[in-house]
């Protein structure tokens, strides 16, 4: 059982603060945590080995070290039922008798559509474990991948060792054995739909290029191939462009992963390097399969409920806060960029005791900057949601797959007299109240056949995730792998976009790495500079000041 001091160290690492600065009764959000980005997920991921089930919404609103520790303590005293990783099912919402009886059975559907998909994939029936529909998000990325408009996601590691080729092959074999996403194929059905197929074994491709940069460039334009593994590996030995260093790359299509998957993959590899035999044991059950998650969401009609909610949410919204609607562009290029480091809020509370959470500050600052650019006082933009707020699907925080979704975020700036602390609290309430509707496609995010306009900017918040260390603790030259360090700084990723602006923000302790990418035909360079400068000024004002909304609006 983890001690309170150990819990403080985990919180300190996730939040980027010293453990002795954390009080037992201080709230996670007030300390700088968030429920939109990944800090809360990282924290719950760190304690996942204790098998504790905690509702994310409750935790981010009221969670303290004391309450989390008590929940973990309580879990240890109960008999926690373990299930096969391919069939994790509902937890907090409960299972009915039929669901419970069939929860641990892996089934193959026998419809004509699925038979066709298996035939096209040239799969041996005995190798097929399960077939499931794809999610709307998977469908979106699949369409882009098949058209060559989006490439692979690359997870890059710098590696050293006496036998990297065989050592890494062993690592990937273990990784595939416990993580179903690595053994998931996508194939077409008779009605021109698609299904995902979980297989017992797969043969992912290995590449041995001499130049890391050229390999990454190739993956960025690589098309999705139906019926083929969506994962491939590369080992680059003694890359001349990087002072002779060695690199290992896991490349995955976006149909199978998201930003949080990088953290999860790092955690899995850390466990493998620490003890391969312990990781391989049968008691270390498979992680949940994304296909079963899709079935669960469909069974609960989550997508349908979300669509109804977002339809009502967007009623009356004016989305033209960057350019006139008639100038909308499909699959445009981000040919402009402003990249800068901005000091993040250091003090989580100011003189009046009001919290200053970085997520609240960023979203409020972006809304105000767009209001100043457009003259509108009802602002809507797209916001990346991590997709793992609900605890209705067991062990969702260890689930690899494209759960991240883009949803509308709407901020009213009508009242000039509203104090900044009240605005920030309203932002937090909006985050919390809409978390339950984070699944399914909402209107006004992507171009649609009904001709509705879509949001003109997207905000993507990323936290610094500590997924793994430097590899094995033993520093022996005789180890097959003696060093393995994540190198996300080497990754480049490009995609076509119909949004005029992509605001990507990565928080490293007390600094924001802000990257604002924009399409010059939709946002002129001069206006882009003004928008960014206004956003930066609003961050500073909201972080420390007592301004009213009217004082921040030009």
UniProtKB/Swiss-Prot annotation:
The chain's disulfide connectivity reads none
Q: Where is this region: Condensation?
A: 124-434
UniProt GO cellular component terms: cytoplasm
Superkingdom classification of source:
Eukaryota
Keyword Ligase belongs to the record: yes
Disulfide bond as a keyword of this entry, yes or no, is no
**GO BP, one example?**
secondary metabolite biosynthetic process
**Could you list the residue ranges that cross the membrane?**
none
Q: In which pathway does it act?
A: Mycotoxin biosynthesis
Record comment regarding domains: ALT12 encodes a nonribosomal peptide synthetase containing two domains, a peptidyl carrier protein domain and a condensation domain.
What's its job?
A: Nonribosomal peptide synthetase; part of the gene cluster that mediates the biosynthesis of the host-selective toxins (HSTs) AAL-toxins, sphinganine-analog mycotoxins responsible for Alternaria stem canker on tomato by the tomato pathotype. ALT1 also selectively transfers methyl groups at the first and the third cycle of chain elongation for AAL toxin.
Q: What is this protein called?
A: Nonribosomal peptide synthetase ALT12
This protein's species is: Alternaria alternata
